[in-house]
Amino acid sequence: MNYSIHRLWYFLIFLACGFTAVAQDSTIQIVFTSDIHYGITRVAFDGASKVPSHVVNVRMIAAMNTLPGLRLPADQGVRAGEVVGPIDYLMITGDIANREEPPAQSAAASWNQFNQDYDQGLTLKDHRGRPLEYLLVPGNHDLSDAIGFYRKMTPRTDPTSMVGIYNRMMHPAVAKTNATWHFPADKINYSREIGGIHFMFITIWPDSANRIWMEKDLSTVDAHVPVVIVAHDPPDGDAAHFRNPNGAHDINRHDRFEGLLEETSKDVQEPMGKEDGKPTNDAFEQRGFVAFLKAHPNIKAYFHGHNNWNQFYTYSGPDHDVHLRTFRADSPMKGKFSSKDETKLSFQLITIDPRSKTLTVRECLWNTDPQHPGKAPVWGESFTMGL
């Protein structure tokens, strides 16, 4: 009898240990950054001035590589207090290449530097011991490099970074080249099922044209499956990114619409005025997106870059009639705050528990002591939400 009891006891212990391992292994972890802007320099970094983006990104990559050995903060979030462990994905929401306005380098040079630094420098592995997977969307700089801009660029167009992102994410049977890639036919819109969550990755912003693709994509998703949108622009968009409503609808210095979205601006815009002025009103277009959100209440969160600072907030729409949990990422090169104070440089770690459909986003401050560049990253803000 005692022998049988002991066997049962050991079996229960084995099961408990197994369930603990499964619980940890079932979590999904994503490093999230944005606007890495290869091709320009930071005013100051680590005691030096005019520091190239290559140098800054290599330092950020080194900080990312330390994540698996760090312990998560005791913030009541997913896996709080546990060792981070494997990282499954790296998510970058665009502006990999800076716009090639002199003296910035070409998109081709920037894309090549990105590949070299990240592909060779990142050592992070997923739960199966494989190199992590990239989740990329283009930014306004990547796309302007490809289709042109209203100020001088050298060369005038270079779609290399758009083509590179397209081939990495869309996996075409025949890889696109700079000669065979065309906009808007070759948008970078795709989705992934990650931990029981449907992630939608969108070119620039979910305008009316992109929402046609999104609607079709969501038609295959059960209404009870949580959905997350990932794009470069914030939920309130950027009015300058729409198609020019004037004249030939082109990209020109007078109107300063950038033509990055297929949807034509329908809002009355303020006069441009000063030389660097640009369109600012996109309330009409936002209302179309809000209607889409209301039609799909399983859209639970939105991740983006473009504005260049770390923020966890709620998007409420131009009429304050929707509530979408939103996460904005810092830029290592052009941070609104971190460009002036490098101790505020950050990326985010997203940890997802697929069983409870819970997501925690944690700010990771990676340069809090510039005098000691190898110092481990420090946890900042965190936010946990149910999906």
Regions from the PLM with identified roles:
Residues M1-Y10:
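Bacterial N-terminal signal peptides that target proteins for export
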Residues W9-G18:
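Bacterial N-terminal signal peptides
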Residues R99-E215, S219-P226, I251-D267, A295, ...:
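Extended active-site neighborhood of metal-dependent phosphoesterases/phosphodiesterases
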Residues A23-S106:
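N-terminal active-site segment of His-dependent metallophosphoesterases
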Residues I28-I30, Y38-A44, A209-W213, G335-K340, ...:
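Short, solvent-exposed loop/turn elements at domain surfaces
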Residues L67-P86, Q120-P131, V174-A179, G288:
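Short mixed-charge
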Residues R211, D222-I299:
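Active-site-proximal segments of metal-dependent phosphoesterases and phosphodiesterases across multiple
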